[in-house]
Amino acid sequence: MSTFFSDTAWICLAVPTVLCGTVFCKYKKSSGQLWSWMVCLAGLCAVCLLILSPFWGLILFSVSCFLMYTYLSGQELLPVDQKAVLVTGGDCGLGHALCKYLDELGFTVFAGVLNENGPGAEELRRTCSPRLSVLQMDITKPVQIKDAYSKVAAMLQDRGLWAVINNAGVLGFPTDGELLLMTDYKQCMAVNFFGTVEVTKTFLPLLRKSKGRLVNVSSMGGGAPMERLASYGSSKAAVTMFSSVMRLELSKWGIKVASIQPGGFLTNIAGTSDKWEKLEKDILDHLPAEVQEDYGQDYILAQRNFLLLINSLASKDFSPVLRDIQHAILAKSPFAYYTPGKGAYLWICLAHYLPIGIYDYFAKRHFGQDKPMPRALRMPNYKKKAT
């Protein structure tokens, strides 16, 4: 009996050790961001051996290790090997940081910028390696996109382009959807959605050569409805759906597609105070008199406080987004969706799985708690008139 117990004990000790060691070796070759999985695996080992019989405990644990090993195999990062990538919106913010980050990793970077003679483009030329090329690329102008394609194709020759990262975007003026001008809706769609589609369609022939990656930067606002973001959220929701459809269609070509849905990062997408003043003036100049009377000028002008709120709450550390984009570009089996940023994954899950009434309650409490009331709703006799 003691010999049997001793043999069983050694088996129960040796098998998990070997399996855990194998999985850990595979883990070290992966992206290095999966430590929580290792903790869960160790916990599973203890549960299996303590609750189940040694035989069934080892069987269940072995199956779990096999599944974990298979999963981690897909998370291994491919070598950079000066793979060529295109990044749009490289002038400032996330796109600017991404161009520098990928250049440091050893990629051949094509940085599409709105102004090739602007300070952002000049800084990229000054601080990055000779592998980085700056391209004039206003993604709302098909001529510039086609010209950029010709330059990239000529420089790559037969190499192919490994990844296209559609990052360029605009926020517009965050306020009630009724107050937004149609020009704001059209501008958000032109840059955030149609620009993404135009760049994708133009550069897909180069992606097919390499069987590479298409990475579209969407937003948490494209997956979870939030007040003040009618134009922006709608355009980003279109980007998310476009990415999902392209993921299905491009799989036959060996191209993998990922959608990045960040939340809460301090980029320059919100614009400057001068830009906001111009947008405020445009709204006040073009709103119908009845609408302006109901909302009140003070309500419209108070929306600029949202800019201060964004700047105070957003993170200046882009590293979670940069790591996720790196994973989407280099992982053998990238995820379809990435949600970097504080609360991004949570809010998207709440929007999809909570009853609508409950989600609306939490969204209004969180995103609209400091929002002023329109003028008409502040009138004491408004409800009496409504009834």
UniProtKB/Swiss-Prot annotation:
Predominant cellular place of this UniProt entry's protein: endoplasmic reticulum
Keyword Endoplasmic reticulum attributed: yes
One Gene Ontology cellular component: endoplasmic reticulum membrane
Binding locations of NAD(+): 82-111
Binding site for substrate: S219
Listed transmembrane segments: 4-24
UniProt topology in membrane: Single-pass type II membrane protein
Superkingdom in the source lineage: Eukaryota
InterPro entries in UniProt: NAD(P)-bd_dom_sf, Sc_DH/Rdtase_CS, SDR_fam
Recorded GO MF terms: 17-alpha,20-alpha-dihydroxypregn-4-en-3-one dehydrogenase [NAD(P)+] activity; estradiol 17-beta-dehydrogenase [NAD(P)+] activity; testosterone dehydrogenase (NAD+) activity
Disulfide bonds: none
GO biological process, one term: in utero embryonic development
Top enzyme class: oxidoreductase
Subcellular location: Endoplasmic reticulum membrane
Keyword Transit peptide found: no
Pfam families according to UniProt: adh_short
PROSITE patterns, alphabetized: ADH_SHORT
Keywords from the named record: Endoplasmic reticulum, Lipid biosynthesis, Lipid metabolism, Membrane, NAD, Oxidoreductase, Signal-anchor, Steroid biosynthesis, Transmembrane, Transmembrane helix
Catalytic residues in the record: Y232
Function: Catalyzes the NAD-dependent oxidation of the highly active 17beta-hydroxysteroids, such as estradiol (E2), testosterone (T), and dihydrotestosterone (DHT), to their less active forms and thus regulates the biological potency of these steroids. Oxidizes estradiol to estrone, testosterone to androstenedione, and dihydrotestosterone to 5alpha-androstan-3,17-dione. Also has 20-alpha-HSD activity.
PANTHER family, per the entry: 17-BETA-HYDROXYSTEROID DEHYDROGENASE TYPE 2, SHORT-CHAIN DEHYDROGENASE/REDUCTASE FAMILY 9C
Similarity remark: Belongs to the short-chain dehydrogenases/reductases (SDR) family.
Subunit field text: Homodimer.
Protein's UniProt name: 17-beta-hydroxysteroid dehydrogenase type 2
Organism: Homo sapiens
Lineage start: Eukaryota, Metazoa, Chordata, Craniata, Vertebrata
Protein encoded by which gene: HSD17B2
